[in-house]
Amino acid sequence: MAVTRTFSIIKPDATRRNLTGAVTKMLEEAGLRVVASKRIHMSREQAEGFYAVHKERPFFGELVEFMISGPVVVQVLEGEDAVKRNRDIMGATNPKDAAPGTIRKELAESIEANSVHGSDSEENAAIEIAYFFKPEEIVG
């Protein structure tokens, strides 16, 4: 397996409940290494740009409002098959459907406040990483 990178956001519901460390611990225990991390308060423009792919979906406005409601932690994760590894440890989007031991099953509040975002492909990971990080901010 090749070592690859993926992108993760610890969402406002998790940072509000002081779960940044718990989420990061679960990511690291799943074999992922944090090679870049910063706590930010997304602007409306950042959130709308990041989630532009969902612009025509009925939940877009609520998603943007949620993502700007408090601080988030954006991270670049590295590991073998990082996208899959991250998605596996995150669990299903709906915490009710997530497997025991996953971030969403153990820490999420609801399908909307589901604690984490993770890239769905290596291609999207590269785009999402570049959206928030300069190359020199990523140190492996």
Swiss-Prot record:
PROSITE patterns: NDPK, NDPK_LIKE. GO terms for biological process: CTP biosynthetic process; GTP biosynthetic process; UTP biosynthetic process. The active site is at residue 117. It catalyses: a 2'-deoxyribonucleoside 5'-diphosphate + ATP = a 2'-deoxyribonucleoside 5'-triphosphate + ADP; a ribonucleoside 5'-diphosphate + ATP = a ribonucleoside 5'-triphosphate + ADP. ATP binds at residues 11, 59, 87, 93, 104, 114. Its EC number is 2.7.4.6. Homotetramer. NCBIfam families: PRK00668.1 (NF001908). Major role in the synthesis of nucleoside triphosphates other than ATP. The ATP gamma phosphate is transferred to the NDP beta phosphate via a ping-pong mechanism, using a phosphorylated active-site intermediate. Belongs to the NDK family. This is Nucleoside diphosphate kinase. It comes from Novosphingobium aromaticivorans (strain ATCC 700278 / DSM 12444 / CCUG 56034 / CIP 105152 / NBRC 16084 / F199). The lineage of its organism: Bacteria, Pseudomonadati, Pseudomonadota, Alphaproteobacteria, Sphingomonadales.
